[in-house]
């Protein structure tokens, strides 16, 4: 039922502070830098999924916007293109001249699907190692970037309907499941503010 799904997603977001720590890590290897930068790219693009990032093509950038269709839902999303995104693209140039980032290669022997699967496993494995270098108690995966964007937007008082649209969710219900991870402390703090308004 819905309840088990929400408990599953309960610890899948990290704070802005932790993301800043991740961004500032001095990393030794290409694999580590690549995994970290893709995590950040996902966060900067409102939690874009790994599959969608891998499949982006240069033609998806038009007139200052990144315009793409979510593979999962077919929904079209437009994201204002920012320097932070361009910097990451510049670091990992296309392998085949067609894709935006150097993740998939049209000319390689392996199918794009096999390449995608292999890359995703490698990136998540690397992110797992990076989890230990920053101050968090969960394991980083590409999925955490998506959850973190939703949660951090909510903490900035962005309405759920806007978050839902931003992420290309089919319904606000999906977004609510993402946001269940907002912790009890925050709810208590909010309640304190409401109580204090009456009692103080």
Protein language model features and the residues they cover:
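Conserved tyrosine-mediated DNA breakage-rejoining catalytic core shared by Y-recombinases
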Residues: 1-2, 55-91
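Long, amphipathic, Lys/Arg-enriched alpha-helical "connector/arm" segment
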Residues: 3-34
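Catalytic-site neighborhood detector that most strongly recognizes the C-terminal catalytic loop/helix
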Residues: 5, 70-74, 167-192
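Active-site/catalytic core of tyrosine-dependent DNA strand-transfer enzymes
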Residues: 13-20, 82-137
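Short, basic (Lys/Arg/His-rich) helix/loop patches that form interaction surfaces
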Residues: 24-30, 124-165
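Short pre-functional
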Residues: 36-49, 152
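Short, polar N-cap/turn motifs at the start of nucleic acid-interacting alpha helices
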Residues: 59-67, 136-138, 158-177
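DNA/chromatin major-groove-contacting recognition/catalytic segments
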Residues: 78-83, 87, 91-92, 180-200
